Amino acid sequence: MPEYRSRTSTAGRNMAGARALWRATGMKDGDFHKPIIAIANSFTQFVPGHVHLKDLGQLVAREIEKVGGVAKEFNTIAVDDGIAMGHDGMLYSLPSREIIADSVEYMANAHCADALVCISNCDKITPGMLMAALRLNIPVVFVSGGPMEAGKTKLSEHKLDLVDAMVIAADESASDEKVAEFERSACPTCGSCSGMFTANSMNCLTEALGLSLPGNGSTLATHADREQLFLRAGRLIVELCHRWYGGEDPTALPRGIATQAAFANAMTLDIAMGGSTNTILHLLAAAQEAEVDFDLTHIDALSRRVPQLCKVAPNTPKYHMEDVHRAGGVYGILGELARGGLLDTGVPTVHSRSLADAIARWDVAVSSDSSVQDFFRAGPAGISTQVAFSQATRWPTLDVDRAEGCIRSVKHAYSAEGGLAVLRGNLAVDGCVVKTAGVDESIHVFEGNARVYESQDAAVAGILADEVKAGDVVVIRYEGPKGGPGMQEMLYPTSYLKSKGLGKQCALLTDGRFSGGTSGLSIGHVSPEAASGGTIGLVEDGDRIRIDIPARRIDLLLDEATLAQRRADADARGWKPRAPRPRKVTSALKAYALLATSADKGAVRNTALLGD
């Protein structure tokens, strides 16, 4: 049987010094034969999705101790993409994913932890911890902080979120008073932003991967029911330890759960729920850590056969995460996908022998368990707060209308093809991605003139100065993993296009990426990026660009001779922005850029460059 990793520092005469230090942390004689379980907490007061996590690690720790484990908590960083948005702070967001992954690895391996509980929530934190968990391959359970409640104001007919505040701020016809009201109302509670943005998308995907408990992605941060997820996670991680170290059960390990089939299931869910395009980036990165063969080719194939079964903000103002939960959460969607023959339900999860078993219990459309029905009636209280588990409001009924409700059956899908697509062509030889769930059908085929900007800042200035006209394709380049560096999100450009009334009349193309809050014809992750010699670096103002989502094509409409000449000129000039940009790139960012791969590889670091 596998021996506890922690025995390296807790067993034998020569470890007296290490045990002395362990004792100084509170361990007693009877603790040295128990599993030492690391709790990676991402509490910070900078991020609303994490501001309520301070005491939750200790909540899990006490539960671990009750069932025979030793819990040791540590913290890692968390960047708020919304606060970092629109300035050089965004250069640090994606690289922070690697820092988070490394920090979890460092702590778990330096102290020989036997297992891991990951308390995450927002955009790069869940992916970073996921990468670390799959890299370490020790028993793990994910439990996130949960989504915030949607905002409400008498000045809007629909519920609000962060994007509404951004859009209204750029609307010159809106009064300062209206902007202030939206600002005060858009983010009323602690939790990850209330739509199907990157944070909530990733927390939902941990359910589909089998690494978190049902409800992890959709139970509100403020609701008392969420406390049970943390308590159950504490008990479950000790059970997983016993299954691995006591029984060598491979399905107690993350790589035994997050197999290729599980990654396909997670991507199927992502496509069906119209998740953030960032999830593609993060799943590709996680698959590499798990040593699973899963790339853009697999995602492209899935996108052609998986329908869209759920439509949530920013793709519609009608529904937010609280509505997804009322409709059955992730397992409501997984149940419909399973009945459509679109999932491998034989894969295990941390909490069930198989996904099929989990669906039978947790899908409200088929479950007769009254506790499950009650669980998914957990709803918002409409009270501004930063306190976790502070309310116990329940919807009077569930939304199980699979014809016209928030979650649809395959027969009544929002669209026959899902919410994400991979495009290829001479402008993106290695691929690019678009969230089709947020694109109006009238512009699924679009051709227009290029309006080229060498940075996000320049594009924002140009859009606000009315340089962009209806029919244009805005091209923002040298914002990829290497060229940015850091692959900035482009929420401000897309929000400002929307505020100018151009959301359905323009396209935006970039080697950067988009916030989960983005909608419209926004195409990101163009690979190769400009800094790596990608064709996007050859585009000039006025060039014609054709986008054909049904055909999965994106092309720069130039002859090969012209492209060859431009490429020769770029080789001679160097693949760098043609206009100066006031951007300070620190040594930390330079180190990331030196190793960064393109988006089609997950923007992970190419550590092969470091040698053996």
From Swiss-Prot:
Co-factor(s): [2Fe-2S] cluster; Mg(2+)
Give GO cellular component annotations, separated by semicolons.
cytosol
Q: Which reaction does it catalyse?
A: (2R)-2,3-dihydroxy-3-methylbutanoate = 3-methyl-2-oxobutanoate + H2O; (2R,3R)-2,3-dihydroxy-3-methylpentanoate = (S)-3-methyl-2-oxopentanoate + H2O
Q: Which residues carry this modification: N6-carboxylysine?
A: K124
GO terms, molecular function = 2 iron, 2 sulfur cluster binding; dihydroxy-acid dehydratase activity; magnesium ion binding
Under InterPro entries, the record lists: Dihydro-acid_dehy_C, DihydroxyA_deHydtase, DiOHA_6PGluconate_deHydtase_CS, ILV_EDD_C, ILV_EDD_N, IlvD/EDD_N
One of its Pfam families is ILV_EDD_C
Please state what class of enzyme this protein is. Answer: lyase
Its Enzyme Commission number(s) read: 4.2.1.9
Question: What is a biological process (GO) this protein takes part in?
Answer: L-valine biosynthetic process
Q: Which residues form the active site?
A: S515
- Binding-site residues, Mg(2+): D81, D123, K124, E489
Query: Is Lyase found in the keyword set?
Result: yes
Superkingdom, natural source: Bacteria
Has the keyword DNA damage been applied to this entry?
no
Pathway where this protein functions: Amino-acid biosynthesis; L-isoleucine biosynthesis; L-isoleucine from 2-oxobutanoate: step 3/4; Amino-acid biosynthesis; L-valine biosynthesis; L-valine from pyruvate: step 3/4
What PROSITE patterns does the record point to?
Answer: ILVD_EDD_1, ILVD_EDD_2
**Key words of the record:** 2Fe-2S, Amino-acid biosynthesis, Branched-chain amino acid biosynthesis, Iron, Iron-sulfur, Lyase, Magnesium, Metal-binding
Its quaternary organisation is: Homodimer.
This chain's function reads:
Functions in the biosynthesis of branched-chain amino acids. Catalyzes the dehydration of (2R,3R)-2,3-dihydroxy-3-methylpentanoate (2,3-dihydroxy-3-methylvalerate) into 2-oxo-3-methylpentanoate (2-oxo-3-methylvalerate) and of (2R)-2,3-dihydroxy-3-methylbutanoate (2,3-dihydroxyisovalerate) into 2-oxo-3-methylbutanoate (2-oxoisovalerate), the penultimate precursor to L-isoleucine and L-valine, respectively.
Question: In which family does this protein belong, per the annotation?
Answer: Belongs to the IlvD/Edd family.
Name of the protein in question: Dihydroxy-acid dehydratase
